[in-house]
């Protein structure tokens, strides 16, 4: 029996809808990262983007366990002297809830060029509505 290797032209992509209302951030992010990579498919190939599209709604209602809202800190730098900026998870959830989930999923994807293509298939929305109804997304139970 020969090993099946997926080809870029033969990949079929589905759309999945995830409602993260009162779901724990890390547990949701791992499931989303696996679907974006295509690890849920029998044709998974590490060097080919075989993943599906994921639509996330209610990002502002995601839950963090413990004291992470106050203690977990995200850093960024402007490349200028003294340009280190830091923001806690609680403030980031208030200002940009989509960014909090995007950072968690990005950290769980491989660190290569393929990850940028995978991350483009992630669509995150704060409210319960999304503009992708025409794609007929399937519900992904997490």
From Swiss-Prot:
Subunit structure: Part of the 50S ribosomal subunit.
UniProt-listed GO biological process terms: negative regulation of translation; translation
UniProt-recorded name of the protein: Large ribosomal subunit protein uL13
Function: This protein is one of the early assembly proteins of the 50S ribosomal subunit, although it is not seen to bind rRNA by itself. It is important during the early stages of 50S assembly.
GO terms for cellular component: cytosolic large ribosomal subunit
Pfam families registered for this protein in UniProt: Ribosomal_L13 (PF00572)
Entry similarity comment: Belongs to the universal ribosomal protein uL13 family.
Disulphide bridges, residue numbers: none
Record-linked SUPFAM superfamilies: Ribosomal protein L13 (SSF52161)
A GO MF label: structural constituent of ribosome
Keywords: Ribonucleoprotein, Ribosomal protein
InterPro entries: Ribosomal_uL13, Ribosomal_uL13_bac-type, Ribosomal_uL13_sf
């Amino acid at each position: 029996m020969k090993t099946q290797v997926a080809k870029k032209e033969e990949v079929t992509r589905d759309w999945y809808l995830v409602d993260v209302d009162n779901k724990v951030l890390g547990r949701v992010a791992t499931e989303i990262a696996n679907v974006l990579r295509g690890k849920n498919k029998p044709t998974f190939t590490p060097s080919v983007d075989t993943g599906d599209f994921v639509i996330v709604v209610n990002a502002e209602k995601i839950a963090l366990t413990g004291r992470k809202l106050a203690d977990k800190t995200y850093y960024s730098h402007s490349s200028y002297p003294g340009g280190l900026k830091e923001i806690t998870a609680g403030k980031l959830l208030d200002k940009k809830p989509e960014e909090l989930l995007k950072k968690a999923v990005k950290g769980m994807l491989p660190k290569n060029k393929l990850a940028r293509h995978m991350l483009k298939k992630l669509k995150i929305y704060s409210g319960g509505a999304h503009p992708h109804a025409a794609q007929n997304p399937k519900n992904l139970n997490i």
